[in-house]
From Swiss-Prot:
An annotated Gene Ontology molecular function: ATP binding
Alphabetized UniProt keyword annotations: DNA damage, DNA repair
Biased composition regions of type Low complexity, renumbered to the chain: 366-381
Record function comment: This protein is involved in the repair of mismatches in DNA. It is required for dam-dependent methyl-directed DNA mismatch repair. May act as a 'molecular matchmaker', a protein that promotes the formation of a stable complex between two or more DNA-binding proteins in an ATP-dependent manner without itself being part of a final effector complex.
Keyword DNA damage attached: yes
Stretches for region Disordered: 366-405
Disulfide bonds: none
Compositionally skewed regions (Gly residues) per UniProt: 382-392
PROSITE patterns in UniProt: DNA_MISMATCH_REPAIR_1
Protein name: DNA mismatch repair protein MutL
Family: Belongs to the DNA mismatch repair MutL/HexB family.
GO biological process, alphabetically ordered: mismatch repair
GO CC annotation: mismatch repair complex
Length: 618
């Protein structure tokens, strides 16, 4: 058989095999189009489980007459126009395949009217070449899509459809998921002429809880713990059921959304399951309704044909962020259910060519805003529902990379393995008693030694040893405690009874060193460390520190600071001249005693006179 271009109808039917799985798939695609069009009310009429009729009517912005034919064509969309748009998707749809695919396996009619038009227009495609016919019609502002006789021309696909009740249950579940994603939209679902579901648009917190209860049931609402967790461009909101009271009926409630898009993501589910594992039985599953907001540049939604899955650029970071957010709420075990607070999202700039994608909360026309200041890492030490100082996760102006570079680099350094510094050697000869400087750095020798010249003498200085002494000085508290730096992702570790007792005994001293933690029955959560430790592999260093403390009978801040300084990893495997000069300046400022009385292993004089005499004799 020769190579040939497939006719449009056959090509669309092949694409429909990926997008249109069953009537519920059609409903999902069409309702998402309505939401992208800025609709605040969507009516869904179903007959015979969707096999006979699917009608979606909305009050969105509508489609212009000139664009109706394009709306039914493949790869035609108003939602993206360039590769930059594809890398930062803000609408629910973007491929431009749904209408063409659906029309190829059904009798589809599209009727629409914009506010600028005096009359509505109707379009439908038919024939082998999918030619589009457009004619005038009567219709208010908005769009109506009618899908008749789904799979009428693909008998094999129609055989795989289940009973009318089963197919409608799938449609009902899709509408439930959409209703949880968009509290601001009224959704009416009818089956065979009877109104089955009616979700009215809500705005206030109490009304949101009523919709949550109507969809998920009163038992879930009674056990729901509200989550409000943020760091930088990552925000986690929603509800998770108290695992101590989770029943089998609640385990079916597992809804997660990424930037408003309903999702079935294994990474998110694993993070939630891991946070609840200490409180859940072996055969139990967590129940949750969670909303993750993230910079669109940091997530790829162009992965699954039906857009059920996403791929995070910083998957481990997202996993641990969700894990800590859920864990913090479960640890507090608040008795009252806290509603999500209405927080006005920061205005988001939408490129002009994408305004047609809709006026929903993913595409709010915005005024120019000032550059956003870096967000302070947020970690919860009080109530989970508080949002003091919270910034909106919105406002991604054509997507500048958010946390990817600075925080991502910090996170990647956590995967490095520290090396132990060498033991001190005998004390080196002291410099001139009146000296305030090690001298001038001439060059770097062997990658980790600085060749110094001072008062006509030449010496080698060990940069790792100098760095260790500097770090010890930075960690040793003076008149005030060392400043604690909140961790990007708090570190949770399992500890023994002896280790927990040692930590509690040394907690005040560790606090002076800038190490803050909370402990429960079998775990300790490190929430802050001093600045010199931010770049360290804390997953190795902290357990070793806990083991060291468990072996001690008495504690002193100087000894703890000395142990930490000896066991941290150098930030400079290969030193440069600039780094050496900067290090020595800090050592001379913070450790002036090292200049007057250098400890062993720091300085080694170089005997130039012997070398010069040897050259003269030759």
């Amino acid at each position: 058989m020769p190579i040939q271009v497939l006719p449009p109808q056959l090509a669309n039917q092949i694409a429909a095999g990926e997008v249109v799985e069953r009537p519920a798939s059609v409903v999902k695609e069409l309702v998402e189009n309505s939401l992208d069009a800025g609709a605040t009310r969507v009516d869904i009429d179903i007959e015979r489980g969707g096999a006979k009729l699917i009608r979606i009517r909305d009050n969105g912005c509508g489609i212009k007459k000139e664009e109706l034919a394009l709306a039914l064509a493949r790869h035609a969309t108003s939602k993206i126009a360039s590769l930059d748009d594809l890398e930062a998707i803000i609408s629910l749809g973007f491929r431009g395949e749904a209408l063409a695919s659906i029309s190829s396996v059904s009798r589809l009619t599209l009727t629409s009217r914009t506010a600028e038009q005096a009359e509505a227009w109707q379009a439908y495609a038919e024939g082998r070449d999918m030619d589009v016919t457009v004619k005038p019609a009567a219709h208010p502002v908005g769009t109506t899509l009618e899908v008749l006789d789904l799979f009428y021309n693909t008998p094999a696909r129609r055989k795989f459809m289940r009973t009318e009740k089963t197919e409608f249950n799938h449609i009902d579940e899709i509408i439930r998921r959409i209703a949880l994603a968009r509290f601001d939209v009224t959704l009416n679902l009818s089956h065979n002429g009877k109104l089955v579901r009616q979700y009215r648009a809500v705005a206030k917190d109490g009304q949101k809880e009523r919709r949550l209860g109507a969809i998920c049931g009163t038992p879930f609402l009674e056990q729901a713990l509200a989550i409000e967790w943020q760091h930088g461009d990552l925000t986690l909101r929603g509800w998770v059921a108290d695992p101590n009271h989770t029943t089998t009926a609640l385990t079916e409630i597992q809804y997660c959304y990424v930037n408003g898009r309903m999702m079935r993501d294994r990474l998110i589910n694993h993070a939630i399951r891991q946070a609840c594992e200490d409180k859940l039985g072996a055969d139990q599953q967590p129940a949750f309704v969670l909303y993750l907001e993230i910079d669109p540049h940091q997530v790829d939604v162009n992965v699954h044909p039906a857009k059920h899955e996403v791929r995070f650029h910083q998957s481990r970071l997202v996993h641990d962020f969700i894990y800590q957010g859920v864990l913090s709420v479960l640890q507090q075990q608040t008795e009252t259910t806290l509603p999500l607070e209405d927080i006005a999202p920061a205005p988001r700039h939408v490129p002009e060519n994408r305004i047609a994608a809709g006026r929903n909360h993913f595409a709010v026309p915005a005024e120019p805003t000032a550059a956003r200041e870096p967000a302070t890492p947020r970690y919860s030490g009080g109530t989970s529902g508080g949002n003091g100082g919270r910034q909106s996760a919105g406002g991604w102006p054509h997507a500048q990379p958010g946390y990817q570079k600075p925080q991502g680099e910090v996170y990647r350094t956590l995967l490095q393995t520290p090396a132990t510094s060498p033991a001190p050697e005998p004390v080196a000869p002291a410099l001139d008693g009146h000296s305030q400087s090690f001298g001038r750095v001439l060059t770097i020798v062997g990658g980790d030694c600085a060749l110094l010249e001072h008062a006509g003498t030449i010496q080698l200085l060990s940069l790792p040893v100098a760095e260790r002494w500097l770090r010890q000085a930075q960690l040793t508290p003076g008149q005030s405690p060392v400043c604690a730096q909140p961790l990007l992702i708090p570190l949770r570790l399992k500890v023994s009874a002896d280790e927990k007792a040692a930590l509690q005994q040394a907690q005040s001293l560790l606090g002076e060193l800038g190490i803050e933690f909370q402990s429960d029955a079998q775990h300790v959560t490190i929430r802050a460390v001093p600045l010199p430790l931010r770049q360290q592999n804390l997953q190795i260093l902290i357990p070793e520190l806990i083991g060291y403390l468990a072996q001690q009978t008495t504690f002193a801040t100087v000894n703890i600071a000395q142990w930490i300084a000896r066991n941290v990893q150098s930030e400079h495997p290969q030193w440069s001249m600039a780094q050496a000069i900067s290090l020595l300046a800090d050592v001379e400022r913070l450790c002036p005693q090292l200049v007057k009385a250098p400890p062993g292993g720091l300085l080694q004089p170089v005997d130039l006179h012997s070398a010069m005499n040897a050259l003269k004799h030759e």
